[in-house]
Amino acid sequence: MNSIHSANSNTVSTSEINTSQIPTDSLESIRNRLNQVHLSLRKLSDQINHHNRHPNKVKLPNYAQFQNQFQVLLTQLHTITSDLENNDELLKNTNVYPLPSFPTTQQEGLITTLLRKKPLPEVDEWIESAIDKRKNEYVNVQKDDEFAQWCLTKIEELREDFQFYGFNSVEELKYLDSEDEKKETEENKKIENQKYEEELKITAGGKSGLHPNRVLKFMCQGVLT
C-alpha cells in the first residue's frame, strides 16, 4: 500500500513542525478501506480463477454468496467515497508515493527503504541542520499561492490592454517596411541561394540537405514535409 505524505498549506514554522491539523485517523481509515476493497476483490478473483483452472473439482460460489460479496464491496466503496469527500481539500495538497509505474517487484529493497517511517541517521542530521539554520524563518505556503494567483490575474489584466498580431514590435515592423530592410532581405536571399547551390555540389546526387526548420519539425511532430 502506498505511503501518504501530507503537505499542510497553513503557515508553519520550520523549527516546530505542526502536524495537529493533519487528520491522520481519516487518512489511515482511507488506507485501510482501500486495502479491504483490494482483499475483497482479490478473494473474488481467486475463487473465479480457481474454478476456471479446475472446473470439474471446484464450483463457483452460488448466487447468494456472490450477492453478499458484492454488497460488502458496495459498502466499502461507499465508505471510501464519503471519506474522500470529507477530506477533499486535504487530499488536493497530498503527495502519494510510490507512483503506480514504480517497479516494486524489481526494486523491493529500495521501496522498503523509501517507505520506512523512521528516517536514516544521516537524514536525521540533515533535518536537524536545516531546522537550526532556518529556525527564525517561516514558510507560508498559502501566501505563496495567493501571490501566484495575483500574478496570473495581473498578467490577464495587462494582456487585455494589448493586441498581438505577431512577434515583432511596432519599431521592428516599421524597419521591415523601410528601404534598408528590403535591401538587407535581398542580400540575405542571395547569400542563402549561394549556400544552397554549394550544398547541391557537395551532396551526392545533387540533392540538397534538409533545412534546419524541417529537421526540427520532424523531431517535434514526426512530420517530414
From Swiss-Prot:
Disulfide topology: none
Domain of life according to the entry: Eukaryota
A matching Pfam family: Med8
Predominant place of localization: nucleus
Gene Ontology cellular-component annotations: core mediator complex; mediator complex
Protein's UniProt keywords contain Transcription: yes
Entry's Gene Ontology BP terms: regulation of transcription by RNA polymerase II
Molecular function (Gene Ontology), one example: transcription coregulator activity
InterPro entries tied to this protein: Mediatior_Med8_fun/met
Subcellular location: Nucleus
Family: Belongs to the Mediator complex subunit 8 family.
Subunit structure: Component of the Mediator complex.
Function: Component of the Mediator complex, a coactivator involved in the regulated transcription of nearly all RNA polymerase II-dependent genes. Mediator functions as a bridge to convey information from gene-specific regulatory proteins to the basal RNA polymerase II transcription machinery. Mediator is recruited to promoters by direct interactions with regulatory proteins and serves as a scaffold for the assembly of a functional preinitiation complex with RNA polymerase II and the general transcription factors.
Protein name: Mediator of RNA polymerase II transcription subunit 8
Native species: Debaryomyces hansenii (strain ATCC 36239 / CBS 767 / BCRC 21394 / JCM 1990 / NBRC 0083 / IGC 2968) (Yeast)
Designated gene of the protein: MED8
